[in-house]
Amino acid sequence: WDGKTDLSHHNLREVEIEDLLPRKKIEVDMDAIAKMLTGKRILITGAAGSIGSDIARQVAKFNPFELILVDQAETPMHDIRLYMACNHKAQKVLTIVGSICNQKQMETLFRNHTPEYVFHAAAYKHVPMMEDNPAMAVQNNIYGTRVIADLSVKYGTKKFVMISTDKAVNPTNVMGCSKRICEIYCQALNAHQQKTQFVTTRFGNVLGSNGSVIPIFKEQIKRGGPVMVTHPDIIRYFMLIPEACRLVLEAGTMGKGGEIFVFDMGQPVKIVDLAKRMITLSGAKNIEIKFSGLRDGEKLYEELLATKENSMPTPHPKIKVAKVREYPYELVLRNEIELYKISESFDDIAIVKKMKEIVPEYKSEVSKYKILDN
């Protein structure tokens, strides 16, 4: 093989995600999860995404009364619809194409279906994309979360579980900061009312999710390389999608409201080692690894707790509670309204400046917004 021609896909062994992250299956309290979900009305936002769709598949097994799935991506939603029709014929499933930012559409949904449990997985998640589009991080991630959270309270949802990220900890990019602001809002709203319990789950990268390194590396290996890694020292915490989703459900049963649950992600993984392992497992030869440099807003390593946070154990060995600073609801709401107004100007610098005011620990890395840090 001359290294120039495309490798035949048939010559390469299909790399299984589980081979890349060998570990014991995480056990969860199935009885508690069943009690929470069986016979209930469950809403999942971002239901077409990697996490949302897996939560949907897991929830469907517990026979909820009604499963309401919302996402703006029509084709993946159609895929989920077909999956449910095939695998859960008796299950009442609603697939709604819509945006969490469309307040009127979401209000109609809540009025008609009054979900008892909400799993909020909808978000823009790609760091470089949000560095270039901070207005959309504000309007989709922050405002969209507020729309769904407020409607949950208005229509008497019992529990709202938000999916957050380790990028919200000491954020270095717009995406991470937007998720930290969502966490702050959920905690403040939890303390502000007694109807709905707001719980946040925070975890790192999930292996094999849409647009993550695994599918990208697979494609690069298939083409004969090079495999592009941003930096030789970059490390990330990884989980398998099903184990992350199982822990989301477990945290949902545990949360009494106001908690930020942090998942034990195991040992961090060097991305370059992951690339080498994938090349070896695929059986490919002479594949070069090249380093492209850190992307805008990218950290060398992620943290699951911020500098001033500490964590408390829970009954589950893989789940801890982060003790974080909380803010009064009126201040949080005022900040969000101001930030949304600024986002309508699509002035990137002004938007990020306000985000840094709200989250003072947000310090930009490899980014045009570094000029805003003092």
Predicted segments, located by residue:
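Conserved Rossmann-fold cofactor-binding substructure of NAD(P)-dependent oxidoreductases
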Residues: 96-117, 297
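Conserved Rossmann-fold NAD(P)-dependent oxidoreductase catalytic core, especially the SDR/UDP-sugar
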Residues: 2-10, 120, 124-184, 188
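Proline-aspartate-enriched helix->loop->beta-strand connector
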Residues: 64-65, 110-119, 127, 157
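Strand-loop microenvironment adjacent to phosphate/nucleotide-handling motifs in alpha/beta enzyme folds
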Residues: 27, 32-34, 188-374
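N-terminal Rossmann NAD(P)H-binding glycine-rich loop of SDR-like oxidoreductase domains
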Residues: 42-62
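Conserved residues in the N-terminal Rossmann fold of short-chain dehydrogenase/reductase
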Residues: 96-97, 139, 291
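Flexible, Lys/Arg-rich cytosolic regulatory linkers and terminal tails that connect or flank
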Residues: 1-41, 153
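Conserved glycine-rich Rossmann-like NAD(P)H-binding loop of the short-chain dehydrogenase/reductase
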Residues: 64-79
